[in-house]
Every structure is written in C-alpha cells, then in structure tokens.
Design a protein with these regions (language model features):
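Catalytic-site neighborhood detector that most strongly recognizes the C-terminal catalytic loop/helix
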Residues: 84, 157-161, 257-282
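Short, Lys/Arg-enriched alpha-helical recognition elements, typified by the DNA-recognition helix
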Residues: 1-59, 73-76, 94
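Short, basic (Lys/Arg/His-rich) helix/loop patches that form interaction surfaces
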Residues: 101-106, 186-189, 209-255, 261-262
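C-terminal catalytic core of Y-nucleophile DNA break-rejoin enzymes
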Residues: 157-178, 189-214, 230
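Conserved tyrosine-mediated DNA breakage-rejoining catalytic core shared by Y-recombinases
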Residues: 131-176
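Basic, Lys/Arg- and aromatic-enriched nucleic-acid-binding interface segment
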Residues: 43, 47, 66-67, 72-127
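Short, charged phosphate-coordinating catalytic segments
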Residues: 58-67, 119-149
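C-terminal secondary-structure termini that scaffold catalytic or DNA-interacting sites
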Residues: 142, 186-189, 198-199, 282-287
Length: 287
C-alpha cells in the first residue's frame, strides 16, 4: 500500500530531483503537502503520506543514499493559510534575479523572472502547469467598450478540468508579456512560452524553485510569521490582491483561479488580514 501511495501521487514530486540536495527534497515536500491540502485531504491523510516519505528517507539514510532527512512541514502549520508575498517583495525578488543575470550572464535567471511575473499576473497554479503553456495557447481580444487588449490563456488538462481559460493583469499584458515574447523571437507556435530551449519541464521547475528559495532566503523574505513562503505563495498573493481590490468579485476570482469560493475562503482568505479588513468595512461602514 505504501508503494502504491508513492507511485500514484507522490512520485511526480520526487522522481527528477537530486536526493543528495536536502533543500530540493524540502521544496518537493512543501509542494506535495501544499497540493494535498488544496485537494482537501484531511490531517490524517496528509500524515499518512508524509509517514510513507519519512520511512523512505530513513531507509535511504540507512543505505547511505542521503545523509539526513529533509525538513517536514509541521501539521499545525500545514492547516494555516499560507502567508502571501507583498508586491514590493516580489519586485525585490525580480530585481535580484536581474542582478544575478548581470553577474552570471545566465538567461535562466531572466526566464525565472518571466515565470514569477506570469504566475503573479493571473490565477495560475504555480508548478509545472504554467511551464507547459505553448505559444498557440494565448490570444488577444479587444474590449469594445474600453478598446483595451485583453490577454487570454487557454490551459489544457488542468488539475480540476480538461480546459480552463484565464485573463491576465493589464500591466502584465502591456509591459511584461512583450518582453517575454521578444526573449525568444523565433519560437514557433508549438514552442513552450517559457524556457523554450529546455525540454524537461520538471527539471526546469526544480531549478526555478531552487533559485527562488535561495534568493528569498538571502533577501530575508522566505519566512513570515514563522511560516515558509515557497513559490506557491505567489498564487495566494494574486488571489488576495484581487479580493482586496474588489471583494464583490469572489466568484469571478474563484473561476479565474480554477477553484471554488469555498476553497478561496478556507485556504487563501479566512486567516488573512485582507478578509478581516473587508469584514471590518462591512461591519462599520463610514457614513
């Protein structure tokens, strides 16, 4: 049964990482637990999954494959809403990525910046999903009323349904997306939008997470209120920002984020100040 659990759900998080890199294992664990939580798995179920992994790592230590176990998220923290990043913090991270590019001339840092800007611009689920977007999966439509160009992405085979469409923030559409397109101007329509020169999407994501974790720790941004903020926290930023700007649009935010209003409350908003502020405004409206 333990092998079945691993192969059915967990292997995709661990099969392409270097087990000797403790931080990579920790990042994979956080991704796994975050997705189990968002799938509405109970504490008991999540504990069973982490027990399987704990036994696996103990066996690996015993056989000299790894030197130590990665850090396992504590259950009391698993159940809390994940702290988001503030916009100015994400800007700091982007600035640092550009500095790393200037220092190393490695364009992977620039494309990591593209990835962060993409997932903060719309209701994407951070992970492999945004990396699978190909050039033919975006289009522009014109809002006849405002004459504004709206950028629409079409995702296939998502976590919850076979096809999902979402729109991007206008700032991203006008200022960031053109930069992404010109980074690889000769790409064909069936080429990946991000990191088109890399075939293995899992390896790309693993490296993105590794860079993100290192830089946010160096900047003193990885932890907030005693909790870690992995790359998935950017999804929380997007949802909370949209809610703060327009609390009446909760159903639209849920639809754009490919989830339900119930999930938005339980996993993104209920434990956050943005919800408390909005409820305060409703309780004590200014006359």
């Amino acid at each position: 049964r333990e092998k079945q659990k691993y192969h059915n759900y967990m292997i995709k998080y661990f099969e392409k990482i270097d087990y000797r890199e403790n931080q990579s294992l920790t990042n994979a664990l956080e991704d796994l637990v975050e997705n189990l939580r968002l799938d509405n798995k109970t504490d008991n179920t999540i504990s069973k999954y982490t027990t399987v992994l704990s036994n696996m790592f103990n066996y690996a230590i015993k056989n000299g494959v790894i030197k130590s176990k990665p850090d396992f998220p504590k259950m009391k923290i698993v159940n809390n809403a994940r702290p988001s990043y503030f916009n100015n913090e994400l800007n700091q991270i982007n600035k640092r990525l550009f500095e790393e590019y200037k220092k190393t001339k490695d364009t992977f840092y620039l494309e990591t910046k593209d990835y962060i800007n993409l997932i903060r611009s719309a209701g994407f689920r951070p992970g492999i999903e945004p990396l699978r977007i190909k050039r033919f999966q975006y289009r522009f439509v014109e809002d006849r009323k405002s004459k504004e160009q709206i950028l629409i992405f079409t995702l296939f085979n998502t976590k919850t349904k076979p096809k999902h469409q979402l729109t991007s923030h206008p700032y991203f559409t006008k200022n960031i997306f053109p930069e992404i397109l010109t980074r690889n101007p000769n790409s064909k329509s069936d080429a990946y939008l991000l990191f088109p020169n890399y075939e293995d999407r899992q390896k790309v994501y693993n490296r993105i997470v590794k860079i993100f974790t290192r830089l946010t720790k160096e900047l003193g941004l990885y932890y907030r209120n005693g909790q870690s903020r992995p790359i998935y926290s950017i999804r929380h930023t997007f949802i909370k920002n949209r809610y703060a700007e327009n609390p009446q649009s909760l159903e639209v935010i849920a639809r754009q984020s490919n989830t339900s209003t119930k999930m938005l409350h339980s996993n993104y908003l209920d434990e956050d100040d943005v919800m408390m502020i909005e409820e305060y405004r409703k309780m004590y409206p200014k006359k």
